[in-house]
Structures are given as C-alpha cells and as structure tokens.
Amino acid sequence: MRFQDAARDGRAVVYAGIQADPLVARAADLLANTDGRMRVLARAVMNGESTDRETWVAMFPTLLGADVRDDIRTEAQAVLDVALEVAQRGDAVRSQVRGAIIEELTARLLARRVPADTIRRERRILFDGVRSEIHPYDVTVERDGSAEAYDCKWGARGISDDVLYQLDDARTHAADEGASLDVALVVFDARRSCAVRLARSTAPADGIRIVPLESLDEMAGAG
C-alpha cells in the first residue's frame, strides 16, 4: 500500500483555488473550536436558503436571542457572520466552498491527535495489482503501520454506493497486503440523516466509520 498525489488536472487546479480562499480557513477555524450547537447553526445557514440575518436570529433564539449569555451570543454571531458569507456565494461555488470547509475542519481536528505532517490532502491509495481509483481521498493520515483515509461530505445525500464501495475496497485491499488502513466518511449532517441514507444503500458499510456532525470531535480523540 502506498500513497500518491492526485493528478493536477483542471478540476484540481480550480478546487485548489477554492481551498485557498481565506473564508475556508476562517470557517474551519471557528467550527473546529466550537460545539455541536454552533455547528448546527452553521450548517443551517450555509445551506443558503436565506441570507437574512434576522431570519436566523429568530430561528436560533437559544444562541442569538437578546437574553442569551453574552459569550454564547458573541460566539454564535461570529459563526453566523461566516456562515452568511458562505450562503451568499452562488450555488455552484457555495457547494465547493462547503466541501472545502469540511475537509479543512477534518484536517484540523485530526491534527489534535496525530502529527500535522502526517496529514495529507487529495491523495490516491495504490495497491499492487489493483487499478487505482479515479477519485482521490479528501484527507489521509499517513503513518507507518497505522494509516487512515477520509472522504468528506457536506450532507447525508453525499453517502452514495460509489463512495462506500471505494472506501470498503481500500480497506479490503490494505488487509490483503497485511497493512492497517482505517476508512471513514465524515458527514456534516445529523446522525439520523446519515442512518436513513445508509439504510437505503446496498453497498458494504460495516468496516467504514461514519462520522456525523454530532461526533466530529471524536476525530481529535486519543488514538
């Protein structure tokens, strides 16, 4: 088992520009250092259904209401500000920005558990005698004897049979070579939504760790 940088094609060049957008880093930083309530707020706003601030203040009174503790409201307002910036992007760009934010958030949380120089982005995993996958993995942890591969999705709709098969194949091929590879799907959506989506899938999922919005901080836990 070995890792390789993804091909630098036109799509990769465009997406690299999205990843380098300062908004991605600011949003990931806020989301990495907050709790589940704020992440739910961010997800709701970033969906782009409304860019009206007062609409969200009314919908999240326990975070943004006038009687909320100052420190909580200040943090929520910061999350709302960044989320509104994302929501105001055009549909296609917004989708790419959201994906880049979840990838960056994943990398930042992993960096609390493993050395930062072992975390890589947009990497393929190669196995002897096996055709390489077309799509690279969003985030990988590359350590001798203990590797990890993560695909990142904005919502549960991103849980497709193709994604699950690719993750399961990588895990299986690694085991065939006597290598350790943990595979996971990070989904910035509710656990229940992920469960409903998985229930409709026919792809193997038993060996794939699903990391929903409620469990993001587990990636930073002791490993």
Where are the regions that the model predicts?
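Intrinsically disordered, low-complexity Ser/Thr/Pro/Gly-rich regulatory segments
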Residues: 1-223
